[in-house]
């Protein structure tokens, strides 16, 4: 009976340990826009890891229909473990695979086939909402 109780207690901690492990697997990045540094977290997916392998990157983000800022990445990321479509929310960092671009959503949008979530901003990202092109440098956080 004592062994059974000890096993039950141990099993209650396994999910909590798994959750804390998931958080440490997520990579923190910094998006620099002028003098502003924006914190973001990449998901623990093949696509996000593939994107992280390209860092640091300097990109010019362009407006796209007032909903997102986009820039060409030059290649598709490994989306083997992602769903076929995704409905983004404001602050999501994604790749639209058919066009091989990064898309940072400044407003929510409907589910789109080929949209792959990479991560999200940790807080205010309104610097990226301004009109016109914005040069950014994306790098792993220290």
Label the model's feature ranges.
Residues 7-15:
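Bacterial N-terminal signal peptides
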């Amino acid at each position: 009976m004592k062994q059974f109780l000890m096993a039950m207690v141990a099993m209650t901690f396994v999910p909590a340990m798994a959750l804390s492990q998931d958080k440490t697997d997520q990579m923190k990045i910094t998006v620099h826009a002028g003098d502003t540094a924006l914190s973001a977290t990449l998901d623990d997916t093949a696509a996000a890891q593939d994107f992280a392998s390209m860092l640091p990157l300097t990109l010019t983000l362009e407006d796209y229909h007032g909903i997102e800022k986009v820039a060409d990445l030059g290649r598709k990321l490994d989306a083997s473990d992602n769903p076929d479509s995704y409905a983004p929310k404001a602050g999501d960092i994604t790749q639209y695979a058919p066009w091989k671009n990064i898309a940072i959503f400044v407003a929510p949008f409907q589910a789109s086939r080929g949209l792959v979530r990479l991560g999200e901003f940790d807080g205010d990202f309104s610097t990226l909402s301004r009109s016109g092109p914005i040069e950014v440098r994306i790098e792993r956080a220290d």
